[in-house]
């Protein structure tokens, strides 16, 4: 028996080295939105188009507004290192205003559900192809059934009868193929159109429409609930009492090309909000003024001076402070999204949200409230006034041998030990 040499398979493996952790902080400015890698740990504001839920992509955050003291990441979703499941806090945004001012379009633009002209053309073409397949299938079934029925009748036909029959079938097929074709008569209309232009096709809201988005601010999750209300009065009477419950932000929406919708914010909508707000919910609510359709600036009927006047009038007449006023356009990319992000950040910084995290408390203690009230009572200067605390200097009992003693001036004896 021949001796065979046995070999062992020893694979030299390198010791496990932990992956380095980047020490440099993540910058949250506009310059690295496009340069961010998809595998970044921070969150992004660029979700996929969702149908019934929120599908999110990782990425970098955005820069905070200049009024905020801290800088941090802001994203739609993110992954935390902790395995503990923490329920996100709720932020309720209520959009109110007249009909046809663009409340629904603003929400769809924030949720990235508005299609461009090229995307809509592809969608219409795909839908037409599906309809054409169903029609062709139905036509084939009709022809087959007709042939079967012809066989059952066992009737002999002349060549003229068959020619007439096939002409009728071809005529029916041409009519069904031309019906609903999106390319007929539209080539000349869309020849010069921009394929990246956002197409806004919305219907009037009946009752309310609710959409949600999950955002991540400084590794803390917030469930943003956007309430789209009907501008017509006949759809509101039944839902007004429960509409303003636990609302954190009231967004007064108007059309800059319609002065009547702007006046309704002052005469109708702010009055309705104050009548239906409870005293407890009003403490955690903030008001914002948003003008839509700024892309139609040539047809503007509401000027910036009118907006400033209304803000001052609301504060004097109703005692309501407008926390911010914006002008947006749903046809411009990311304009509505940046505006909504600034509103959400303002609410979080001021504690205007429903806190579902038991580990974090936003309740202000009595001592802090007392010191804050004392500060506002004593200081009559604006916010740039700096108050310094002065300490009373007490005489030290120890002797400093490097400095002359005060008792020298009194001609007293000094003894240094």
Swiss-Prot record:
CDD domains named in the record: Rab (cd00154)
Lipidation (S-geranylgeranyl cysteine): 415-416
Region listing for Disordered, in residue ranges: 1-34
Location relative to the cell: Endoplasmic reticulum membrane; Bud tip; Bud neck
Amino acids binding GTP: 97-104, 228-232, 292-295
Organism domain of life: Eukaryota
Function: Involved in the positive control of both endoplasmic reticulum (ER) and mitochondrion inheritance during cell divison. Required for the MYO2-dependent retention of newly inherited mitochondria at the bud tip in developing daughter cells.
Oligomer and partners: Interacts with MYO2 (via C-terminal tail domain). Interacts with YIF1, YIP3, YIP4 and YIP5.
Entry protein name: GTP-binding protein YPT11
Organism in which the protein naturally occurs: Saccharomyces cerevisiae (strain RM11-1a)
Originating gene: YPT11
